[in-house]
């Protein structure tokens, strides 16, 4: 079975290339990376940075994930990414996508040992406030989640 880290690489990493000037980039890549098997994945982001740079995000700005989990991290700088969004008229098995190249901060969820990206959470134009500067209850909850019940 594909590991979460390997799935992240397959679905989100496209180092050393870009989508610029290729309106068919998403149609080609979504198919090539098996995100149109059985259904059309509606939205997906490819990151055009080195795997090392993306792995490094796991030690950058700790923020809350969209699902409320505390193991998300936002990049310190913007990254070259491509957003792929299924067009309204396309239906499986003929998945069609709109390709948009952008420079944005990325947010990934990290897990494991080594601590690596396992989920692409979001991309934004403006950086978020890191978790430690949030009000106190969050700190207690985080400590508790880490199994440190000294509070």
UniProtKB/Swiss-Prot annotation:
Bias (Polar residues): 14-25
Positions of substrate binding: 7, 10, 41-45, 66, 85
Subcellular localization(s) per the UniProt record: Secreted
EC number(s) stated in the UniProt entry for this protein: 3.1.27.-
Active site, per annotation: 12, 119
SUPFAM superfamilies, sorted: RNase A-like
Disulfide bonds, paired cysteine numbers: 26-84, 40-95, 58-110, 65-72
Record-level GO cellular component terms: extracellular region
Main location as per UniProt: secreted
Disordered, as annotated region: 1-25
Superkingdom assignment: Eukaryota
Keywords (A to Z) from UniProt: Disulfide bond, Endonuclease, Glycoprotein, Hydrolase, Nuclease, Secreted
GO biological process: defense response to Gram-positive bacterium
Protein family per UniProt: Belongs to the pancreatic ribonuclease family.
PANTHER family tied to this protein: RIBONUCLEASE, RIBONUCLEASE PANCREATIC
Protein name: Brain ribonuclease
Species of origin: Capreolus capreolus (European roe deer)
Gene (name only): BRN
């Amino acid at each position: 079975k594909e590991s979460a880290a390997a799935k992240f690489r397959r679905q989100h990493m496209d180092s050393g290339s870009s989508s610029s000037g290729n309106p068919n980039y998403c149609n080609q890549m979504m198919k090539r990376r098996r995100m149109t098997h059985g259904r059309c994945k509606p939205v997906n982001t490819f990151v055009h940075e080195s795997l090392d740079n993306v792995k490094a995000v796991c030690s950058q700005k700790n923020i809350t994930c969209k699902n409320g989990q505390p193991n998300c991290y936002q990049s310190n700088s913007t990254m070259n990414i491509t957003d792929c969004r299924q067009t309204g008229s396309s239906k499986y098995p003929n998945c069609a996508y709109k390709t948009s190249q952008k420079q944005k901060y990325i947010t990934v969820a990290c897990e494991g040992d080594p601590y690596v990206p396992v989920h692409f959470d979001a991309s934004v134009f403006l950086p978020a406030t890191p978790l430690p500067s949030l009000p106190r209850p969050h700190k207690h909850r985080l400590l508790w989640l880490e199994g440190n019940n000294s509070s």
